[in-house]
Amino acid sequence: MAVHPVLAQVTRRIQERSHATRTDYLEQVDAMAARPPQVRSMGCANVAHAFAALPGADKIRIVEEKGPNIGIVTAYNDVLSAHAPFARYPDILKDEARRHGATAQVAGGVPAMCDGVTQGMPGMELSLFSRDAIAMSTAIALTHDTFDAALMLGVCDKIVPGLLIGALHFGHLPTVFVPAGPMTSGLSNHEKAKVRELAAQGLVGRQELLAAENAAYHEQGTCTFYGTANSNQMLLEAMGLHVPGTSFINPAEAERELLTREAMRTVLSITHSKRFAPIGRVVDERCIVNAMVALLATGGSTNHLIHWVAVARAAGIIIDWDDFEQLSAVVPLLARIYPNGSADVNQFQKAGGPGYVIAQLLQAGLMHDDVLTVREDGMAAFGRIPHVENGSLLWNDAGASGDDGVLRPASAPFSPTGGLKLLKGNMGRSVIKVSAVPEDRHHLRAPAWVFDSQDELQAAFKSGALEQACQSNGHNGVVCVVRWQGPQANGMPELHKLTPPLAVLQGKGYKMALVTDGRMSGASGKVPAAIHLSPEALAGGPLAKVRSGDLMTLNASTGQLQAEVSEAEWSSRELAQMPDALKRSNGRGLGRELFAGFRRNALSAEEGACTWLLN
């Protein structure tokens, strides 16, 4: 199947835009790859330090037999349910390496925080920046420079992008990502959301709410909604950086350990065969476009409009939100997974999962098939589904959807477009995810109410003032503007705690929307939200010009976000300043002082909110 012309056009434009930076990056990759193995050129003391802790037989394999040594970078901790299974992975991987004449070492650990724990709490202000801290930690782990290849153990929101950014700075190393899978299904995401809305209204108490949350999040594995963590896994499949079909096998399933061992065999196959497939070559412009398409086709997390900009830049590739929007116009929505539907990721996997999606996109010419992957048989391998037969892993073609209420073919999708829209106007540039928003909510016009924090909005809801404003302003609704939430202001926290109160008011028939320079969770959906507004208010963005009472238009169909203020008045308005109380409290306590440099150096959301790339 020929590549879709829009896909080809966007890819060419990215290649042209990135020519200088990508050329420079690949020169560095090739220079590093051309060096002799560092173990052979290191001093004896260096070598002794590097392998002092290894069993004698492993030392012989590395030093005398010159076998491959694989560096493992792990995000293990047992606070994150998704990462708890990684506790035993290093032993499994080391055992598999020895079976093939190789060795493996845990090169280092990286921090991994759970956004579910920190939602609405001060710790959430470190969430986005933890991505770059993880990238730096990955670099520290690999900088011992004694490894022939690497395995990355991570799953969740900022962890995978951080590991990927870090790995791309060691682009000469063959690298495979190793996930742990989702938890089995508990209380449905729909039922959980209903209880949250009841709690927001005060109709159920803490005991009932806690019982519902415990029933939803109940064991090891990722959360079962299709948020940022599970979107990460879909994108890694589309980039060819996983063992095919490994994303959504539950931690306790028989396939899981076999797939983990296969990850070691896969990375060793690259080192043994001398097939030049280091991660810096695998992740090229076509690979990045494939990831963008997979995100759109599955209704994935809006967080990736920040993260994958940063990931691409780590490989010398420059993408922007125009690229996403143009792809979204031609990429069909093939999946309905909560919050874009009622199914969870286990039902998605049962219906065909990533293998089905990728096979459909390849057949429709909506993914590049002529790309390097960690598998010798290329992108076609990722359109297949693994299963166990007589104790061995086998892969079958994806075939037909197992449930057309969850997965549909590209010829008969849920929607002809991917459900992400770029919004532009006198407010700047932002994005909106419309795949989960009812169609009658894609366009609204209502007065703004400006809030300086999410706590202010919560207080207005709880007091009844927000509903009263909806009733009395003649527009039956409010556009809630929450500013000072960008990367430079406070680290750009997710504002997921605002979803239940806004959803309650929308459920009562009011026209509600959120406009912010902050982020929303990958699990947020049914309330229209213009997010990631750039430039942010603290950087002098137009968001700082909005005043409560300004009439606002949000139109996802036409891509418009506009404050209906005359051009003369708008241009003459002074920018609001961050309140002194926020200045005093932002970045203080719970270690936030340590990230002052991150806030100071952070680029805009559309530039990936990078703290390590200074323009």
Regions found by a protein language model. Give the residues of each.
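Acidic/charged coordination and interface sites in well-structured regions
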Residues: 88
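N-terminal small/polar loop signature for handling phosphorylated ligands or for N-terminal nucleophile
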Residues: 107-145
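A short, small-residue-rich loop immediately preceding and capping a beta-strand
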Residues: 142-163, 174-178
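Catalytic or ion-coupling anion/metal-binding cores of large enzyme and transporter domains
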Residues: 1-68, 74-78, 82, 91-110, ...
